[in-house]
Structure formats: structure tokens, C-alpha cells
Amino acid sequence: MKISKIAQPYIFKRINKKLNNRTVLAAMTNKQSHDNGIISNDEINWLHERAKGGFGIITTAATNVSIEGKAWEGEFGVYDDIHIKQLVKLTSAIHSTKSFIIAQLFHGGIRSPQKITGHIPLSSSVLECAESSTGKSKKATEKDIKKIINDFTNSAFRCYEAGFDGIELHGAHGYLISQFLGEKTNLRNDKWGGKLKNRARLLLNIIDSIKKNVPEDFIVGVRISPEIESIGIKLKDTIKLVGILRALPIDFIHLSCWDVFLKSKFLTDEKRTLTQIITESYTNLPTIISTGNVWSSKDAENLLKQGADLIGVGRVAIGHPYWATKISDLNYNPQRPPFTVSQLKNAKLNETFISYMKNWKNFVVEK
């Protein structure tokens, strides 16, 4: 049997830490935790099952760095010391395997409903906002921005205290950091808006502050969306952003592509994939993770050839928690959805998570 390259160990160059293989469980919303932000045993079991399944890195669901940054019910938080005890239980469980555990830190911004947080949603600018009682978001003041940076920093330090191997800053999918990055959502004319270097200032200041407050060997990475037309994130700006990020002492850039085999929506004459375009734009990049619609071993091998160092997966790991162990077989091509409720229960999804996945067309069937 031929063995896939994805099953081979990988070393983070900056800190000389070795992963067992090149697989990454990407962050996925699962809504399994408690209203006070304490992570539940169900969510721990869900992640632990995938660590037992051989993933090199386990990434938690997005975890809010402040009460006002919460975006959905059942989201666990890291904004208060009361969260640490149960997070230690999570990291201890993951470290009983060979996996690393990374917390994805985020603030929902305009996507944090007032009915959940009790606060008018905060964003880079005053924007139309269905989640606000006023119909508008609040433009972040200098004081707000300072608090945001401190919230991310304090949350990262709590993750260190709780035993995480590192953190991933969620700069993708239209949440707060990407609202600052987007041309259509960042309408500011101060140092936090305008040209890309200003729109990226929040992200860069968060990184700088975190790096000053955690040990040198604590993993710090960033997840970004190469393109989001609705908020004005263009590929040309993402390429420039990657150029800025590669000069920083970070360990990875995670490209959230949704489908790693698709081409750019903006560069219609470009034949290469988003991952190819970005990885071929520079030398000496930090570790590149790419995620989106990888299912089989051949898919994963294809993505490595595109220039990714590590392979992120989401949906396939919901139904196949031991995907990372089986991917070494180059002929591995696991079942696609739909999955039965029984299959998902056996894969350590609780009733709430299964109900949430029923919102995804043709993902869940009763029998």
C-alpha cells in the first residue's frame, strides 16, 4: 500500500515543534457548550474523539474573547477565568493523544446578536445590522479598539494557562477582524481604515500584543478568507496581507477557501487555485494550512501539490472522526453525506449539534 505524504510528520520551523502528521481539524461551530461560556463535556468528547482519530492539530470551535463578541448560543468562551478549569480538562484529554490543541479566538462583531450579548453589535463602521435593535452597528471607538486588543490578548494568555499549544486568530468569514479588513465594511478614514495597512492594523496590533504576553514557543496563527465579495475582501489585498504577515513571528497562515479546488472569483483569467496563487507569490512563508472541501486522500494530495503544508478539514471529520488515521491509504475515499443520526451519535455529536447539522442541506437523515 502506498503511503500518503500527509501521514508524515511536520515541523513548525520557527519553534521546532513536530506534528505527528499534516492533518488539521479545522474550527467548526457545534453549539454544544454552556450559556456561561464554560465548555461542556460533550464538546470536549467531540474534540477528543478526533484527537484519538489521529489528527495532527485539533482546533476548537471559535471561542469568544468577550461577552459582546459572542455570536451564537452554545459557544464556549475564554473571556473569564471561570472558563480555565474545564479548558484544562480539554487540553489534558487532547494531550493524552499525540495531537496538538489550538484555540480559535474570535469576536463576532456585526454578527454578534444583541439578543444574545445584550450589546449593540460593534464593528469597524456604522453598518446595516439586522442583529441590532437600532438596525445599525456601533462604530468602534479608540477605547473600544483598545479593549478588543486587550480581550484577545487576555484570552490568548488564558489559553496558555489552560495548556493549549497555541491559538488561531479568526480573521475570516466576515467576523470582526475581517470586518476591519474588508473595503465594504471598513469605511473609516482614521488610522484603522483606508489603505490595507490601516485596515490590517487591528489584526497586526492583536498579534503584537499577544506575542508580548505569551512564551516564545506558544503557537500563534491567523485564519483568513482569500476572498469575500460581500465585505470587500479581494484576492490582491489578501496576497499583500500574506506578505505583511510573513514578516511577523507567527507560525501559520490558514487559508479558508470553502473549496480548495475552485479558482478566484475576481481574477477570472487566472487558472490557478487560491492556494496556488498565494503560496506561489512568496518564498519563506510560515506554515500554510488550507481548508475547503477536501474529502479523499487524492484531494489531500492535490492540496499539498497546490502548496499547502498542512491539510485542514471540517465536514469530513464530522462523520469520520478517524479520517486522519485512514488518510495514509492513497485510495481512501470515505462516505459522503448524508449521515444517519445514529452515525453522528456514534461520532460523538450530541443532539444539539445534530440538530444544527440538519440545517445543512442533505447532511443528516433520520435512518
Q: What are these regions, as identified by a protein language model?
A:
Residues M1-K367:
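Flavin-dependent oxidoreductase catalytic cores
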